[in-house]
């Protein structure tokens, strides 16, 4: 692989595998509809300081991540592509960082390309590139901070060191405004032990304040602005989103300490078979400064999140770039030495996984069909699985010539699978598609009501109206609903009939209900029976006309 073609080829893969599929499927609940609506509300209201979710205060995250999604909607339109563009761009920039740091570490064009290709073909990374949430953005800022740190440490000229530390501060500041204080902590977890081990603590004391100053300069204007607009923001954000989430006895998403170990293996698909070789080589060369840095980058965040009480799978996304570098380093060396055994085993492992999945799908489809007269979706699934199987068959039997084949299978799978989901999944997990089918009628109504936050946010985003009355549902909007100007948006079951009478005096009402059991059936039964009604999966849309006065 020549220097000339590496980046254009990666760009082409980015366009085909990351950007092209962005508009092929609806918004997943709860994350995608939430982030789409919050960022859209910034555009509609002009309030870019304090995040609001369906017109209610929502202080679980800072503002910068919403800014990026809002900019995507402003540039490309308030559509699926616009909502997801920030995630795709952030992931693409992380791929570029992987290429650049690999080139700095080893100065081998093919190795740089291999590392970047492995990173962008990780199933979880490619999946996140087409998923509208804050994790791809936060991962990019963490990646940028640590790549900048390595460039600073590896530079001999004072000007280059200063620039590296300044970029580190910029990344920490933006990461902080995207997801919070972890953006400051994670680089420290790597930089401090590495600098002490290398006996370069004087350099840390000299240049560290530069990074701190830049981070403060970047984040302080917004931090002061949000405090001036919402004095309770920092109390809620610090204690609820940091202390309770990671250290509290009632921490969210509690899981055992080993939770991330199998996840790290799964996240390395389709390159799991290369892990033993990569880890063995990393251990043998652990005294090399670059390998030691990558080892700290991989292990320290993994250790921190493993010891915290609250755990979510996406917390360890910042660990994947150093993992890709270690894997790519080992894979490129195997190619140079013409040692294809590990690559062949990797292809064989993926081949077996694909065959088992295909056989399982055929069995389920014959016994209890997932797809009900959905030939188009079923064909897409079989194309995706067949692509995975063929690509890994090639690597299994021609490992040195077809070493990159699993990347093709992985990217094809992630590109096609969301568009190939059964109608039952789309109806229940992507309510914006049902709303889209009746968007004209819902947009024409005066008032909106929903008993489900995911459906409500999908409705709000599709009709471009933040004000949705929440019928017997609170969830993550508990904080916002507690404010005097928010409580009026809440409608309890014993109030809904009175609310409906008052609303229909001034205009028509659009209702989106999720009906999963008897409780929701009772909620539905309290609503008027006239008007137009549509059903799909467990969703019900009602258009209730204005009552004559």
Swiss-Prot record:
Query: What's the catalysed reaction?
Result: 4-amino-4-deoxy-alpha-L-arabinopyranosyl di-trans,octa-cis-undecaprenyl phosphate + lipid IVA = lipid IIA + di-trans,octa-cis-undecaprenyl phosphate
GO CC annotation: plasma membrane
What are the TM regions of this chain, as residue ranges?
A: 9-29, 80-102, 112-132, 133-153, 176-196, 204-224, 259-279, 290-310, 312-332, 342-362, 377-397, 402-422
Q: Its function?
A: Catalyzes the transfer of the L-Ara4N moiety of the glycolipid undecaprenyl phosphate-alpha-L-Ara4N to lipid A. The modified arabinose is attached to lipid A and is required for resistance to polymyxin and cationic antimicrobial peptides.
Q: What class of enzyme is it?
A: transferase
Indicate what this protein is called per its UniProt record: Undecaprenyl phosphate-alpha-4-amino-4-deoxy-L-arabinose arabinosyl transferase 2
User: One of this protein's GO BP terms?
Assistant: response to iron(III) ion
Q: What is its main location?
A: membrane
Which keywords fit this entry according to its UniProt record? Cell inner membrane, Cell membrane, Glycosyltransferase, Lipid A biosynthesis, Lipid biosynthesis, Lipid metabolism, Lipopolysaccharide biosynthesis, Membrane, Transferase, Transmembrane, Transmembrane helix
Q: Which HAMAP family match?
A: ArnT_transfer
- What InterPro entries does this protein's entry cite? ArnT_tfrase, Glyco_trans_39/83, LipidA_mod_glycosyltrf_83
* Protein origin, superkingdom: Bacteria
Query: Which topology term describes how it sits in the membrane?
Result: Multi-pass membrane protein
EC annotation? Answer: 2.4.2.43
Q: Would the keyword Lipid metabolism turn up in this protein's UniProt record?
A: yes
Its Gene Ontology molecular function terms?
4-amino-4-deoxy-L-arabinose transferase activity; mannosyltransferase activity
Q: In which pathway does it act?
A: Lipopolysaccharide metabolism; 4-amino-4-deoxy-beta-L-arabinose-lipid A biosynthesis
